[in-house]
Amino acid sequence: MTNGRVPMTPAGEQALRAELSRLKKTERPAIIEAIAEARDHGDLKENAEYHAARERQGIIEGRIKDIESKLSNAQVIDVTKLQANGMVIFGATVTVINVDTEEETTYQIVGEDEADIDNHKISVVAPLARALIKKEVGDEIILDTPKGKVTYEIVDVEYK
């Protein structure tokens, strides 16, 4: 994350581009139409439809600017094209075992916007991801959690 660049996987970039396209081609025109319709209803001071549409327009325009900024600062990293030699890096899929409970979990380390714990995608800035970066299979990490220290062993690293 040097030079203001934001790391992102190719899938993360694709998802942002799809959202941006939807906002510009579908959402923006629909809200412009809704504002025009609400304006036709007369007095704008007491026109709830108009004010709601304007508020929605502000939200959409804000999100468009946010996505455009993220894409312009994105450093797309395709982990399949890197020579990491078994080391955990951004984009890697890492399988760990909780040493105490023997519970095995697999995570992919992704950009902040891509993080989705339900799909086992953790942000590169998350404490677990930061602890895993530059480690290899067989290494153990100790993570401070609200319930105390947890030790994980890295059992697999994939680049997919």
Curated annotation (Swiss-Prot):
Statement: the UniProt record of this protein carries the keyword Kinase: no
Keyword set, alphabetical order: DNA-binding, Transcription, Transcription regulation
Record field: transmembrane: none
Disulfide bonds listed in the record: none
Domain of life: Bacteria
Keyword ATP-binding: no
GO terms, molecular function: DNA binding; RNA polymerase binding
GO biological process, one term: regulation of DNA-templated transcription elongation
InterPro entries: GreA/GreB_C_sf, TF_GreA/GreB_CS, Tscrpt_elong_fac_GreA, Tscrpt_elong_fac_GreA/B, Tscrpt_elong_fac_GreA/B_C, Tscrpt_elong_fac_GreA/B_fam, Tscrpt_elong_fac_GreA/B_N, Tscrpt_elong_fac_GreA/B_N_sf
Entry-linked Pfam families: GreA_GreB (PF01272), GreA_GreB_N (PF03449)
Record's function text: Necessary for efficient RNA polymerase transcription elongation past template-encoded arresting sites. The arresting sites in DNA have the property of trapping a certain fraction of elongating RNA polymerases that pass through, resulting in locked ternary complexes. Cleavage of the nascent transcript by cleavage factors such as GreA or GreB allows the resumption of elongation from the new 3'terminus. GreA releases sequences of 2 to 3 nucleotides.
Family, per entry: Belongs to the GreA/GreB family.
Protein name: Transcription elongation factor GreA
Organism: Francisella philomiragia subsp. philomiragia (strain ATCC 25017 / CCUG 19701 / FSC 153 / O#319-036)
